[in-house]
Amino acid sequence: GIYVAGQEPFDTDGDWSYREIPLDTPLDQLRVAHTRYDTIGVAEDVDSVLAMHRLLELEAEGLVGEAQTPTYSFMGYIPDPSVLMEVTGPEVAGRLKEDGVDGVVIGTT
């Protein structure tokens, strides 16, 4: 999962929690915690899995409406997704709904 330097890294053995990431976070402050695949590509271009800067570019070009901040990052490896489905997923969905978000972009690792 993608997180900001200073935040607690994701548990690479499986983590159903999430991290809030402000859209204006500098690229050099983003980190990746994952051991189930080669993260070199993510280190080179974090937008390949968390398209926050690309979304801001689309917003600036007028192709999408206002981008929501913060964005939410989840771990890609969750062997038991029950807590994600029953607790953290609905929690984030509720926050997005409260903020009036019309659509989401989901990236995978």
What are the residue ranges of the model-derived segments?
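An N-terminal assembly and electron-transfer interface module characteristic of large anaerobic redox
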Residues: 1-109
